[in-house]
A protein has these predicted regions:
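Short, thiol/selenol-centered motifs that function as redox-active sites or metal-ligating centers
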Residues: 58-67, 137, 193-196
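Bacterial Sec-dependent N-terminal signal peptides
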Residues: 1-21
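Thiol-/selenol-based redox modules, centered on thioredoxin-like
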Residues: 139-202
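Short active-site neighborhood of thiol/selenol oxidoreductases, capturing the structured segment around
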Residues: 42-65, 174
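Structural microenvironment flanking redox-active thiols in thiol-disulfide oxidoreductases
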Residues: 65-110, 121-127
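N-terminal "domain-start" segment that seeds a small globular fold
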Residues: 19-44
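Short, internal strand/loop/helix patches
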Residues: 105-141, 145-149
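Loop/turn elements at helix/coil->beta-strand transitions in domains of secreted/extracellular proteins
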Residues: 49-51, 80-85, 112-116, 134
Length: 202
């Protein structure tokens, strides 16, 4: 009987965790995370923003590296329109030391990041958002009710950045959001490396 109860508790716990993944239309939580300049960053700091690209990103994943310039380009194109990029590294550096906070600082300086690169050292934000991979994009729209999840998934459909005819999912969603139109494709699959969870955080 005790074993059955334990199994049920594990199943219920798993369901509860699965329910924390954001869906389109959900209100996303804000955060207060440390940036590579050692300052704490919250979306509440951006008083004039219309929304945000929140992108789970890291140092060591080949997919994150492949998309790095495109993430920089997203910020260059949309920050001035009220949709700045905020990147968050959720990985456990105990699994891969390349994702340590010190290495994050080096990477951001080396690649000339123009946006915050935050460390989610407790992994609570990644779990709350339901992030699956790096990179994983969440486009949030600022409303009176809160930050509404308007798009989630991949940046585009070209992981190797070799196809001029790529479908720019994140840009298309942002353009629709800014124009006050419905986002035709609001969810895609995030293609990247799995997040390196702490053993106690899985």
């Amino acid at each position: 009987m005790k074993k059955l109860i334990m199994v049920l508790l594990v199943v219920i716990s798993g369901i509860a965790k699965a329910q924390t993944s954001y869906k389109i239309g959900d209100i996303a939580t804000d955060f207060n995370l440390k940036n590579v300049d050692n300052k704490m960053i919250s979306m509440a700091n951006y008083k004039e923003a219309k929304g945000f690209f929140v992108i789970f990103h890291c140092n060591q994943c080949p997919y994150s590296k492949a998309y790095e310039n495109r993430i920089i380009a997203l910020n260059a194109k949309y920050a001035s329109k009220g949709l700045p990029v905020i990147t968050i590294n959720p990985n456990d550096p105990a699994i891969n030391p390349e994702d340590s906070f010190e290495k994050m600082k080096i990477r951001a300086k080396q690649e000339k990041y123009t946006f915050p690169y935050l460390v989610d050292d407790t992994q609570e934000i990644a779990k709350a958002y339901g992030a699956k991979a790096t990179p994983h994009v969440y486009l949030l729209k600022k409303t009176d009710e809160g930050l509404v999840v308007s798009y989630t998934g991949a940046i585009d459909n070209d992981t190797e950045n070799v196809n001029d005819a790529k479908i720019k999912y994140a840009e298309n969603a942002a353009d629709a959001l800014l124009a006050g139109k419905e986002i035709e494709l609001a969810q895609t699959k995030a293609i990247g490396c799995s997040i390196k969870w702490k053993k106690t955080a899985q």
